[in-house]
Amino acid sequence: MNTDLQDYSHKRLNILTGEWVMVSPFRANRPWQGKSEAVTNGRRPAHDESCYLCAGNTRINGEQNPKYKDIFVFTNDFPALQKDSAPFISKDGLLEAQGEQGICKVICFSPYHSRSLADMQPIEIGKVVSAWQREYKELGDMDGINYVQIFENKGSVMGCSNPHPHGQIWSQSSLPNEVIKKDQHQLQYFKENSRTILGDYIVQELVHKERIIFENHFFVVLIPFWAIWPFEAMIVPKIAQKDILELSDFEVALFAEAIAVLTQAYDKLFNCSFPYSSGIHQAPTGGENNDHWHWHMSFYPPLLRSATVKKFMVGYEMFGSPQRDITAEYAATQLKNLID
């Protein structure tokens, strides 16, 4: 780019959604007298008798967890969606509601209560990825299921109700809002260029390098040019794939390595168990031609300056558009310097 974006307030385009984010680099050092988060760095026990997710323990619904050794997947005891929910369309003037069906599952990443993905070896994370593949396939093949959302909320600041290492998988009959936006923008670009938009974006990022944190043979880990959250990151395959089912065993291992490298760098940044929400966006499962899709995994961590100061999405960001202080380039440099 011809302009040094570090010196000016500006906005950046998210090519996947068509939305803009305001960037204000000169605000990064403004004084802070607002809310500070508590830091909980104490080590948890490997097994917690009161935890509903630990191996062998009884969940709130009375069912006993198996004494699992690595991965454990079960149907959520308090699901947001129900498979047998009646389909309907209700319309009264401008008031409209539609029935939504789905299945929600919980995936425990490890039997060890004290761990997170950052504490796990790539071979262990690879088992998590393989479980994601199985669930995406199994749920996506069901009648009435058109999208499968894999995600993780880590840390109480992100609303996680249990510190045991786990994620969730929600499958549903329609496409969620964020997926609709990404589907439309990827499709438009593919129709015009016969290539995926993320494929072309990665080529450009590999030339500039300034936002890349890590890369291996098959994946790039970077701070997206349009990042909203201070240390937001994205893991993207270098070659276009519609979904994680296209990953070979070797590529699963490389994906696991990328997750391990990023989450470990996060924990080193402020010397804490770094909170975030992460999720995989991939092709819908309804049987359409999805050649325009290029799957990717995003991480949205809230911490801004330290383990106790987080970003708040309030004010202008609620009523105008997202805004960030530190640039994506600065964030990438900070994380890259922490990778061994």
Tell where the protein language model's regions lie, with residue ranges:
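Active-site microenvironments that recognize anionic phosphate/pyrophosphate groups
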Residues: 1-164, 170-244, 250, 264, ...
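Extended C-terminal subregions enriched in glycine
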Residues: 254-273
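Acidic/histidine-rich, metal-coordinating catalytic segments
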Residues: 278-282
